[in-house]
Regions:
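Conserved helix-turn-beta segment of the N-terminal RecA-like "Helicase ATP-binding" lobe
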Residues: 120-145
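Conserved two-lobed SF2 helicase motor
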Residues: 147-152
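Structural beta-sheet core signal
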Residues: 114-115, 139
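Pre-Walker A (pre-P-loop) alpha-helix and adjacent loop at the N terminus of AAA/AAA+ ATPase modules
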Residues: 73-84
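Phosphate- and divalent-cation-binding pockets in alpha/beta enzyme and binding domains
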Residues: 38, 100, 124-125
Length: 152
């Protein structure tokens, strides 16, 4: 069994995985946190059991999926899914990027953090989550500090 941990922006492992280097100081194989997914997949594909102590996620209640996508939004979501659920959705203003993101959240049903640059957008996102997914999101910013399974 391999144990994965998080420490100051690093993924630590007691066994080697591609992208990790031995750190004498940490007494573990270490790599930047963005490698987490690849490291975890490497051990899974190698048939190695993983004790994952990296993420301590908040519980996510069941989501209602009332998001309906237009064809071009569905194409954007499908392209994102085919690229390993990574990348950026680029659509013009008013084309429904929020709807695409809400559909992705509903499909994956995993704890989610949405980062926005203004309090107005935080409020808009929270309203959309309530309306389309049927859950009360957490909100951090503008004097609020409540974290939930979906947090804006």
């Amino acid at each position: 069994m391999v144990t994965l941990r998080f420490f100051k922006g690093l993924i630590l492992s007691d066994s080697y995985a591609p992208g990790l280097k031995w750190s004498e100081e940490l007494k573990a194989y270490a790599g930047l946190a963005y490698l987490y997914r690849e490291v975890k997949e490497y051990f899974k594909e190698s048939g190695v059991e993983v004790s994952d102590q990296v993420l301590d996620t908040l519980p996510l209640p069941p989501l209602r999926d009332s998001v309906r996508l237009r064809d071009y939004q569905r194409e954007a979501l499908d392209a994102w899914l085919k690229s390993g659920k990574r990348g950026v959705i680029v659509l013009p203003t008013g084309a429904g990027k929020t709807s695409v993101a809400l559909k992705a959240i509903a499909l994956l049903s995993v704890p989610t953090l949405i980062v926005v640059p203004t309090i107005d957008l935080m409020t808009q996102w929270a309203s959309a989550i309530r309306e389309k997914l049927g859950v009360e999101p957490g909100m951090v910013g503008g004097g609020r500090d409540e974290k939930k399974g979906i947090t804006v």
